[in-house]
Amino acid sequence: MHNYVIIDAFASVPLEGNPVAVFFDADDLPPAQMQRIAREMNLSESTFVLKPRNGGDALIRIFTPVNELPFAGHPLLGTAIALGAHTDNHRLYLETQMGTIAFELERQNGSVIAASMDQPIPTWTALGRDAELLKALGISDSTFPIEIYHNGPRHVFVGLPSIDALSALHPDHRALSNFHDMAINCFAGAGRRWRSRMFSPAYGVVEDAATGSAAGPLAIHLARHGQIEFGQPVEILQGVEIGRPSLMFAKAEGRAEQLTRVEVSGNGVTFGRGTIVL
């Protein structure tokens, strides 16, 4: 038997944000079993908490319904908030396949209500399949260069001219499935406030409510293309079109040639608890 909790990440009230199922004491579960459990839960991600291997507080494995991820934003933020309920520490170190991720926890009346994470610094390059992607999205152009960022998962960014245009998107998901091992992030906005939608048949997600691993790269993308200054925090609202509004905050410090830190933060709230009988 294994206990789990469902955290709605990047939300301050239940039934908003992006849910993640966090399974505790999972050292006895083989990876194939973790994958089957994640498929049974059928959330965008489930995480499994194991004993640490490299001096952190816990080792975390992350599974979508179809594959394991080396790093993901909302599942780790939700996991940190879930683990924070079992410790008085204000800082947690969670081991992942992309290294150890540091978290700062924010508490209110004794409960963890938010967390911030230092994300892996990504690499990026031009996508090189612009026409094919634009056709799959049903649009004619991107307001910024179409580039792909890699920080564990791979995120492609496509700019839309307005929030109305972003909300009106109806992509061809079958065509998007030809973009293997990547998520397509479409965004619009100005200044410090931006809206985003993420589509990724490759990761088993038709549309994601909150993509924390893309929030940091989006802040970098905006700074690189002159929309904000490096070090300036941005607010990213996602999930509106699917009824799961999710609010993320991101900041990229340094400069394009030498990034020093990528920070993503947000709230999280417990939706439910349960036990699986295996």
Curated annotation (Swiss-Prot):
Pathway, per record: Antibiotic biosynthesis; phenazine biosynthesis
Keywords from the named record: Antibiotic biosynthesis, Isomerase, Virulence
Keyword Ribosomal protein in annotation: no
GO molecular-function terms, A-Z: trans-2,3-dihydro-3-hydroxy-anthranilate isomerase activity
Short name of any one Pfam family annotated for the protein: PhzC-PhzF
Catalysis performed (reactions): (5S,6S)-6-amino-5-hydroxycyclohexa-1,3-diene-1-carboxyate = (1R,6S)-6-amino-5-oxocyclohex-2-ene-1-carboxylate
GO annotation, biological process: phenazine biosynthetic process
SUPFAM superfamilies linked to this entry: Diaminopimelate epimerase-like
InterPro entries on file: Phenazine_PhzF-like
Active site: E45
Superkingdom of this protein's organism: Bacteria
A GO-annotated cellular component: cytoplasm
Keyword Thylakoid: no
The enzyme's E.C. designation: 5.3.3.17
Record's subunit section: Homodimer.
Function: Isomerase that catalyzes the condensation of two molecules of trans-2,3-dihydro-3-hydroxyanthranilic acid (DHHA) into the phenazine ring system. The final product is not yet known.
Similarity comment: family membership: Belongs to the PhzF family.
Protein name: Trans-2,3-dihydro-3-hydroxyanthranilate isomerase
Organism: Pseudomonas fluorescens
